[in-house]
Amino acid sequence: VPQQVYILSRDQIERANAQTAADLLTTDGLLTVQKSQQGGGSPMIRGFESSRVLLVMDNVKMNNLIYRAGHLQNIITVDPSILERVEVLYGPSSVSYGSDALGGVVAFRSKNPVLGDGGKTLFSGNAFMRYGSAN
């Protein structure tokens, strides 16, 4: 079944320098995020609220229609700095993802971990900085 898919690559995610996954997804207008407390939000695709939009992290469902209808705040729990890519599938994806994906799917893929090779000590890190002003 053909459908519209938008993919955010690792480079696009890093260049966006978003503070939350909600900010990341609204930067390019991929979907609407209904803002709530602490910068979180409920994703909305084509008028479907978050209970009808499936959120998936590494092929594991983050929300489930059984638990609650209405606004869900699961999108704030994803840190953009751990993401390798994000796929936004618009429209019904019930065939591939089940009945929870009536409005669409937001599929997050995390980066692969860096593992040591035996006796060597492995140390790495990264940093990013942002500046903001109210004026």
Give a label for each model feature.
Residues 1-120:
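Acidic, small-polar-rich N-terminal luminal/periplasmic segments of exported/outer-membrane proteins
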Residues 65, 133-135:
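Gram-negative outer-membrane beta-barrel proteins
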Residues 127-133:
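Transmembrane beta-barrel strands of outer-membrane/channel proteins
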